[in-house]
């Protein structure tokens, strides 16, 4: 941790990944696990993650060894996910909704066909598609502005 006080009363942090305050932690390593989990959360639920929720999932990945696909799989069991993506939703509709949630646009025909066919043929699961799209360079760019000042979360402290 290196802090440099400037003449304008601004602290500059160098080589710092996390800053802990009394009420939260701010993850500055937005291209690491916190950024990955944030992008997945945003894509799955079409909203910014709540501090408690993202703190739990960051912990599960960093301390528990969960992969993004495993996190996405657990998201699919939540009531919120099932309200957004009904069980009878077609693969094409699911992929289209994920593109809209994550990238803010309709899928291009190649992407739609690739992911919908992968789901139909059993080459990928919905959690895998969710993780794939969330990890895409385009989604990283879309979310970059949202996390430019870090990712706020509450650390998971319960085992």
Please provide the spans of the model-predicted regions:
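Substrate/cofactor-recognition hotspot
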Residues: 17-159
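Acidic, glycine-rich low-complexity segments
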Residues: 1-25
């Amino acid at each position: 941790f290196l802090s440099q006080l400037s003449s304008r009363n601004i602290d500059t942090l160098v080589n710092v990944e996390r800053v802990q305050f009394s009420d939260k932690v701010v993850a500055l390593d937005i291209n690491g696990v916190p950024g990955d989990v944030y992008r997945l959360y945003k894509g799955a639920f079409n909203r910014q993650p709540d501090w408690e929720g993202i703190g739990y999932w960051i912990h599960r990945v960093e301390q528990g060894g969960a992969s993004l696909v495993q996190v996405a799989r657990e998201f699919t069991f939540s009531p919120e996910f099932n309200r957004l993506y009904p069980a009878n939703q077609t693969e094409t509709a699911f992929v289209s909704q994920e593109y809209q949630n994550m990238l803010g646009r309709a899928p291009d025909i190649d992407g739609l066909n690739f992911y919908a066919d992968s789901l139909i043929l059993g080459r990928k699961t919905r959690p895998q598609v969710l993780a794939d799209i969330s990890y895409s360079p385009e989604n990283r760019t879309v979310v970059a502005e949202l996390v430019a000042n870090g990712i706020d979360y509450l650390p998971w402290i319960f085992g």
